Regions:
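Non-catalytic pre-domain segments flanking phosphatase-related domains
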Residues: 1-26
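Basic, amphipathic juxtamembrane/active-site segments
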Residues: 34-53, 131-138
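Conserved Lys-Pro-Asp/Glu-containing loop-to-beta segment of HAD-superfamily phosphomonoesterases
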Residues: 99-120, 126
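Short amphipathic alpha-helix that is part of the acyltransferase structural core
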Residues: 192-223
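Conserved beta-hairpin
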Residues: 222, 227-264
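Acyl-donor binding region in acyl/amide transferases
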Residues: 245, 254-326
Length: 353
């Protein structure tokens, strides 16, 4: 039975991943009152602080509200809060379908979402349709910022800028929709610069965050702590490289990480990941091809660990296109390094090793 206090909606709610996006209802949740019925509505006292604190922690936010979109957005603008919500879904659809739309737009799994509503029916509907979503009764807002799921271990510079980076993505995507020509021609207009660097101590918090947050473009889903990554950074038997991407609209931040174990005659890629935010930018294989080039120049064999799951098939396809083959049906893939794809012509590539 679902508790009316909604401390947890059911046993499945008790063990959730770190939240990447909080989706808010509006009426009697974000504000007191019903927009279409009341003459005036008022922001709940604690809401502004919660929204700004979540934003500073790198947690994205959106809206799923049954309302008239124009009136609701005008009210959010009046409260100076509209800029905090990405891809708001203000319509008469089910809350679960609105959450799915937001997840698709942000390219995030719904298992990293939380949903806040004052109506038990809406919480139950989302819990039934999307049991992976952490559902929170609006009556419990006072405890929200203290929840473990809302407290990332580190708050990095990339975290603080995450919403602004997504807003830049919205501008890019709108430009792409208006562009007349091929995708490659559009990408050429972005003036992208892809940089691979040896990870420095100041990169390690973001590196750990990437191992925890990145699920789709991730070869093994291994997670590494700050201390482990710091060890690899200083080890003669490992290469720990981090990638960043910039274009004419601004920085995507640190978006890629690779860990290579280096033995005398063979190297093994222990982890290769790319942020899903750059999935459509044609940069997904640059790090892999760079490691292949390094291995070839050092006259060593190159293999990679790969652990398949229901989210990372795209990485497997990237490996196959790069010439990697399974070794005796183990978790290892290996390449003969005969063919290494060049960096796309529309990307400026640089290293700081």
């Amino acid at each position: 039975m679902i508790s009316t206090k909604a401390e947890v909606l059911n046993n499945k709610q008790a063990d959730k991943k770190a939240v990447k996006c909080v989706v808010w209802d509006l009426d009697n949740t974000l504000w007191d009152g019903v927009l279409l019925e009341d003459d005036r509505i008022f922001l709940r006292n604690e809401v502004v602080e919660i929204i700004k604190r979540l934003d500073s922690r790198g947690i994205l936010q959106s809206i799923a509200s049954k309302n008239y979109a124009a009136k609701a957005m005008a009210q959010l603008q009046e409260f100076d809060l509209d800029e905090y919500f990405l891809y708001p879904q203000i319509n008469w659809n089910s809350k679960s379908s609105s959450i799915q739309e937001i997840a698709h737009a942000l390219n995030l799994g719904v298992d990293t979402f939380a949903f806040i509503d004052d109506q038990l029916f809406e919480l139950e509907e989302v819990n039934f349709s999307l049991p992976q979503v952490l559902c929170i009764n609006a009556a419990e807002l006072g405890h929200l910022l203290d929840m473990p799921e809302m407290n990332p271990r580190f708050i990095t510079e990339d975290s603080k800028l995450r919403r602004l980076m997504y807003i830049s993505d919205i501008v890019r995507n709108n430009s792409e929709k208006k562009f007349v020509g091929t995708q490659e021609e559009f990408l050429a207009t972005l003036n992208m610069t892809f940089t691979i660097s040896s990870a420095q101590e100041e990169d390690l918090q973001r590196a750990e965050e990437l191992t925890l947050r990145t699920n789709q473009l991730n070869t093994t889903a291994y997670t590494y702590s700050y201390d482990e990554l710091n060890h690899f950074r200083q080890s003669d038997q490992h290469k720990l490289l981090i990638a960043s991407l910039d274009d004419k609209y601004g920085s995507y931040g640190k978006i890629g990480l690779v860990l290579v174990e280096c033995q005398e005659s063979a190297w093994t890629i222990k982890l290769l990941l790319m942020s899903c935010r750059v999935m459509s930018r044609g940069v997904g294989t640059i790090m892999l091809n760079y490691i292949m080039t390094l291995a070839k120049n050092n006259n060593v064999r190159l293999r990679s660990e790969f652990i398949a799951n229901d989210r990372n098939r795209m990485m497997y396809v990237s490996y196959k296109f790069a010439g990697f083959k399974e070794i005796d049906k183990t978790i290892f893939l290996e390449t003969d390094l005969m063919i290494i794809q060049p960096v796309p012509s529309y990307i400026k590539f640089q290293t700081r090793i």
